[in-house]
Design a protein with these regions (language model features):
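Solvent-exposed, non-transmembrane helices and loops of integral membrane proteins
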Residues: 91-126, 231-257
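Alpha-helical transmembrane segments and their immediate juxtamembrane boundary regions
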Residues: 26-79, 170-226
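Cytosolic/matrix-facing juxtamembrane and C-terminal tails of multi-pass cellular membrane proteins
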Residues: 2-17, 21, 214-257
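Charged, amphipathic alpha-helical oligomerization/scaffolding segments
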Residues: 85, 89-92, 96, 154-157, ...
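Membrane-proximal, non-transmembrane alpha-helical segments
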Residues: 6-19, 132-176
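Membrane-interface amphipathic/juxtamembrane segments adjacent to transmembrane helices
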Residues: 9-14, 70-115
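Sequence termini and other peripheral, non-core segments
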Residues: 1-49, 53, 86-89
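Short, non-transmembrane cytosolic segments of multipass membrane proteins
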Residues: 1-5, 103-149
Length: 257
């Protein structure tokens, strides 16, 4: 195993398709997340519309928003799960950490082909472009500043994965904090007008989403702490030990899901 072998293997047609499909799943999950938040907020706003007439319709509208948000959240989780599975499969096939052989199941292959066939022009651009091109693509996913050999090459890829995932999560955390601050401001402003119990009822969807997101971040930072610890141990014990790389890869896969 060397950095050169990884560069060749990652640009094989099937691996490029897998990376493209994983990116599409993550992007779709992100869009669904915005829709879920939007529906939760809309449900909250509906609860404060004038209800002298048509109060039943307003209540039904609020409930429909919550139900639709729930269904979209299920689809979001499925997309995110597929993306994490595809990224794991890509790393298994390209890095071969803890596994010498890698085979793509029929179910995974059909999923990848279906996603790639949906937008053929976009797919063609993505597999042709690298991350530094415009628009950024999936070619040359792992780029090396120098030549690495053996387990050092595998560890360098894991280091890049840990950095990318951390950067993405910081952006999401900032968005969640901003949303929470805006929500708290709205609650304090509206509570004297509508009453605290009305506020609580209208906030059910948003509160469930915030609890879900808080749970995700707690798990994320627990895994990040473990990842940092294992990476530090590997850095202090060169060349990287195969068993330590397997443990690190498992933690990275858990954090993606």
């Amino acid at each position: 195993m060397s950095s050169k072998e990884i560069q060749v293997r990652q640009n094989q047609e099937l691996q490029l398709k897998i990376q493209y499909a994983a990116r599409e799943c993550y992007n779709t999950a992100e869009k669904l997340n915005y829709w879920v938040w939007g529906l939760c907020i809309l449900s909250f706003v509906i609860g404060f519309l004038p209800n002298e007439s048509g109060s039943v319709l307003l209540s039904v509208g609020s409930i429909l928003c919550d139900v639709l948000a729930f269904l979209l959240n299920i689809a979001l989780v499925k997309k995110n799960s597929n993306a994490a599975m595809l990224r794991k499969h890509f790393d298994d096939c390209v890095l071969k950490i803890g596994c010498e052989e890698c085979s793509t199941s029929r179910e995974t292959f059909e999923l990848v082909e279906k996603i790639c066939a949906k937008h053929p022009q976009k797919f063609a651009t993505q597999i042709k472009n690298s991350g530094t091109d415009s628009p950024p693509g999936v070619k040359d996913w792992y780029s090396f500043s120098k030549k690495y050999e053996g387990s050092e090459a595998q560890f360098e890829c894991q280091r890049m994965n840990a950095w990318w995932d951390s950067k993405l999560s910081q952006w999401r955390l900032g968005l969640a904090i901003t949303s929470t601050v805006i929500l708290m401001g709205a609650v304090f402003y509206l509570a004297p007008i509508k009453g605290i119990w009305t506020i609580i009822v209208c906030l059910v969807g948003i509160m469930l989403k915030l609890i879900e997101r808080a749970r995700e971040y707690i798990l994320y930072y627990q895994l990040s702490y473990k990842i940092s610890g294992v990476m530090e141990i590997i850095r202090l014990n060169q060349p990287p030990d195969e068993k330590a790389l397997v443990v690190l890869q498992d933690l990275i896969n858990q954090r993606r899901s």
